[in-house]
Amino acid sequence: MQSIHALLLTAAVCILFQGCGGSEPEHRLYAALFKNYNQFVRPVKNASDPVIIQFEVSMSQLVKVDEVNQIMETNLWLKHIWNDYKLRWNPVDYGGAEFIRVPSGQIWKPDIVLYNNAVGDFQVDDKTKALLKYTGDVTWIPPAIFKSSCKIDVTYFPFDYQNCTMKFGSWSYDKAKIDLVLIGSTMNLKDYWESGEWAIIKAPGYKHDIKYNCCEEIYTDITYSLYIRRLPLFYTINMIIPCLLISFLTVLVFYLPSDCGEKVTLCISVLLSLTVFLLVITETIPSTSLVIPLIGEYLLFTMIFVTLSIVITVFVLNVHYRTPKTHTMPVWVRTIFLNLLPRIMFMTRPTSDEENNQKPKPFYTSEFSNLNCFNSSEIKCCKDGFVCQDMACSCCQYQRMKFSDFSGNLTRSSSSESVDPLFSFSVLSPEMRDAIESVKYIAENMKMQNEAKEIQDDWKYVAMVIDRIFLWVFILVCILGTAGLFLQPLMTGDDM
């Protein structure tokens, strides 16, 4: 047992010394480089020479865009390359080692910060290591999560484009001490992780030399302009399409007949559904008072649309149920709504001639137009004084017999001249005259009822014409309003 322990201990010691022997050149190199190294002094031989910093930003992820607080959160990799003459060596003296990785906190680094940082540290963390090359070139690529200030314009939300800038530069050194050189002309997007809400259109970079009011020196900065476009699919499905459907239901209110009694009910139901929908999506819309978002304008447009439909529906129902006892139809209403507008909108109304042609001809002539079935128990068998086709109807048989006998009496008592109506009426019996007078009274009442019904039908037709007018008006307003609102961002996007 003791021999086994001795064997294991010997193997561990051998492995340890072997590892130390393999890293011994790197250990000597590290000790030689930082023996007299001062990390607070710029790595230049001449104090008047600037340190050339090659700088590039790589976008890893666009985390979030906060429209309310005007903040863009990004995950970036900042690439710094410069030359430090104090960190040079001959690879031959150190086992051929050409590269060495050292903690970035032990070497001099440029203090590159994000000028328009909104939250958190302005400078990146130095916990990552830097790569040193035997020629003195230092490559340092620290990752960082920045929350930069960005002026968000939500006018065309959810079809909006944003331009967010990120300004990097040295906070302490002017151009005479540190000169920045941009690597490439755009932000590096090779390792970019696609966002589910935003798409990056382009991200050009620019170098600026600016003289600030506080100082006489010129400071160099590198600014990236990030042009991003919101992906509107989520908002289209969950916000815009429901609003379009609600607007379509509002249009159908004017196609619903007034007699069904459900026009106002449908209007109120549509308004309630829109109100509930607005409460649900309130948190989705950017809550800002600077501008009204496009989707907010459309929701407001739909709300006014539905409210106006309720007002018009109440007016149409008021017109629909008017009677001669309560309202007199003006001449201009009859001219415009019964004659002019129906022809313009291709509305056809059955005329009185067509209705009369569909009725059967009466059995009585002009001289006996007031004859009718005067038996109250049998008057239910016939309609409007016309002979029915049922030969067993006693009422119609009686009318035929009376008409035949009366015609015979008139023929026998008449001469070659035409029959005098007064004589014709005088030969009737008193009972017959009373019956005829009663029938006259009934006929006059029926005529008055028919005239009143015609006026009521005219009011109903006026209400139908008004409904048809607003049906087309609301269809046009819905189409033009929707197209006008949502074509604006498309035309703006083409200019970018």
Curated annotation (Swiss-Prot):
Q: Where do the TM regions start and end?
A: 242-257, 260-276, 299-317, 466-484
Whether Isomerase counts among this entry's keywords is: no
According to UniProt, the reaction catalysed is: K(+)(in) = K(+)(out); Na(+)(in) = Na(+)(out); Ca(2+)(in) = Ca(2+)(out)
Reported regulation of activity: Activated by a myriad of ligands such as acetylcholine, cytisine, nicotine, choline and epibatidine. The heteropentamer CHRNA3:CHRNB2 activity is blocked by alpha-conotoxins ImI, ImII, PnIA, GID and MII. The heteropentamer CHRNA3:CHRNB4 activity is blocked by the alpha-conotoxin ImI and AuIB.
- Give an example GO cellular component term for this record: cation channel complex
Q: How does it sit in the membrane?
A: Multi-pass membrane protein
Subunit description: Neuronal AChR is composed of two different types of subunits: alpha and beta. CHRNA3/Alpha-3 subunit can be combined to CHRNB2/beta-2 or CHRNB4/beta-4 to give rise to functional receptors.
Q: Which NCBIfam families match?
A: LIC
This protein's name: Neuronal acetylcholine receptor subunit alpha-3
Q: Give the species.
A: Gallus gallus
| Lineage, broadest ranks | Eukaryota, Metazoa, Chordata, Craniata, Vertebrata
Q: Which gene encodes it?
A: CHRNA3
